[in-house]
Amino acid sequence: PVNVYHADFKIKINNAVEKASSIVLCAVQKNLHAARKVLSGIIGNVPKNNKPKTIIFDLRFLSAIKQKVFLGSEKTLFVKHTAMMREACKELPQSVEYVPLACEAHSHRSVALAKTVAAPIMATGVGSALMYATSSGPYYAQSLSGSPDIEMIKNRMAQLFTQLDASVRNKYRPAFDKWNELVDKLNHERNTVPFACLTTILSTAINETPEGDTNVAVVMGCKSAKDRTISIVLGNSMLQTLFEKRLADGREIEKLFDQQGYFNCDSLTAKELMMLKDLFDIRVLHLSNKFNVGLQGNINTDVLQDSFFKNVDF
């Protein structure tokens, strides 16, 4: 529970330019001692520069869907974790602001399957209990984050973005605009992967620029920081490279979204398609799921394949 993982991404924009960004991964923390240890790991991964302030954007991939087998949604986990992290931040000698945000992270297609097919067939065993746990609606629940939390992260990102140099703002304006569109729609798992990716891209741009007084640490995790998180990090690695290259070339990222907000393959060039094929590896998800629950695929794998990328023939 107190492990902190550091995911590094190196993105080759062209032969002359390579970008690097990082994400800190950690599980939900349920006590102050664990939160202190996790926070120490997060701060240790903040860029080493002269900016005196740090802001932590903590994206929690949890589910607001009401569950039958367990005691409800994962709201209690979210409330406890964020309370412990806020308390731990207050104890630090330096200025660290903690801004959490919940992102829906259960596939609604799998929920529908659990209601109709899987639960009756898998009548016994832990697998059926876990699958059926998410089968009580509503499918599209209200986000675990309230309106004040959403407004806070919007305001903070806007403040950080306006501190950027004008040329950097112009380059990343499409990413910022799309981020602002998605931040209000995180009660649907379709938006979780692209939102996480855009948060990483904008935070990297903020950290790279000498303007401003604040570093941004992007933290991601579900309950355990394993299967759901790995699913989203893999989606991030695919999208971040694609988005960054399009932003560098002045090409649209909006065309990568269809009218319903899902990933659109139609605008991909042959080179982009090959790049995505190289970046996607289903074995990463299978290994994660097998390690976590003993199965090569489960409902959490579908966060990637049945949500934003549901129209992609993997």
Predicted regions and their residues:
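Cys-dependent protein tyrosine phosphatase-like superfamily
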Residues: 1-221, 231-314
